[in-house]
């Protein structure tokens, strides 16, 4: 009789261990950001028109209704992240206050040669460009070479006595950081005009601010909304760049006709994306920082777009 009881007890313990193991495995699977995300979101929306969301792959993100500046989805909005190529947005916003778009800018070999190996380029040549050409080269193909040429030129405006490209770029970056602090970008610090720098930092809140400023310029909207952008140089020649934003690519599975810009950025294992989306007669800004892969940043933003499309609250 005792042996039978022992046997039953052993089976019960074994069964209990199996249940615990399966339960633990299922729990770990459910808490992954991508699993049951739709159900999680619907539960949140039942209780609030705005929610802090942990079910996205990105380290930080924010969805903003630009018609009323209301944040609808947010995650770690004040947490500092690597801006990567999104640093170029701050460079352009400041640069637009220092010079005219039609300024003719010489692309010096010294500045171009500062481009780090393996980084994104616009194949800038040693010739003259309009400033707006170079802004487009920074925004569309995310050209780091163009960023150094722009910083070199603007540094020369700020410090005409500087003799080398490196000196001019250093002056520009110092003045840029001063400007950022004065303008209220309190969590943004940049050390390289291209964003190829693992010491830099920003937040989705600061990105929201700079993008809102840039969207006031029609030329900025025109540049970032195109999958292919053709620039006409001062000598009459033309160069065409392809946008790194896959949402604009008609051949991509992520293509969305209602996405009208803005920009991508990636460095090391962090993948960033800022998107301007039109729906319900309004514009929505999505800033996403620190996804683990190229596809996950698009999947996150794609899901937010789906939320916008289906939300009765955001239609108002």
What role is predicted for each listed range?
Residues 34-205, 214-215:
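Active-site-adjacent loops and short helices of periplasmic peptidoglycan-processing enzymes
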């Amino acid at each position: 009789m005792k042996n039978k009881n022992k046997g039953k007890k052993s089976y019960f313990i074994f069964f209990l261990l199996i249940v615990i193991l399966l339960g633990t495995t299922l729990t770990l699977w459910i808490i992954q950001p991508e699993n049951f995300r739709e159900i999680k979101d619907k539960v949140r929306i039942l209780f609030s028109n705005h929610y802090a969301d942990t079910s996205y792959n990105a380290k930080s993100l924010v969805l903003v209704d630009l018609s009323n500046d209301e944040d609808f989805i947010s995650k770690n909005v004040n947490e500092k992240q690597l801006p990567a190529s999104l640093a170029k947005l701050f460079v352009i916003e400041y640069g637009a206050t220092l010079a005219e778009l039609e300024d003719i800018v010489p692309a010096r070999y010294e500045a171009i040669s500062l481009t780090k190996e393996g980084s994104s380029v616009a194949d800038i040549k040693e010739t003259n460009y309009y400033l707006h050409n170079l802004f487009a080269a920074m925004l569309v193909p995310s050209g780091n070479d163009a960023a150094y040429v722009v910083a070199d030129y603007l540094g020369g405006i700020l410090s005409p006595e500087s003799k080398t490209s490196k000196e001019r770029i250093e002056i520009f970056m110092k003045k840029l950081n001063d400007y950022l602090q004065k303008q209220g970008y309190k969590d943004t610090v940049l050390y390289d005009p291209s964003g190829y720098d693992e010491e830099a930092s920003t937040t989705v809140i600061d990105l929201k601010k700079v993008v809102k400023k840039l969207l006031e310029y029609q030329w900025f909207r025109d540049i970032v909304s195109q999958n292919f952008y053709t620039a006409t140089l001062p000598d009459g020649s033309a160069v065409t760049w392809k946008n790194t934003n896959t949402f604009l690519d008609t051949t991509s599975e992520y293509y969305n006709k209602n996405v009208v810009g803005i920009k991508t950025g990636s460095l090391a294992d962090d993948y960033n994306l800022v998107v301007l989306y039109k729906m319900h007669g309004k514009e929505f800004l999505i800033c996403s920082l620190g996804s683990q892969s190229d596809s996950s940043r698009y999947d996150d933003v794609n899901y937010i777009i789906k939320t916008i499309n289906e939300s009765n609250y955001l239609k108002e």
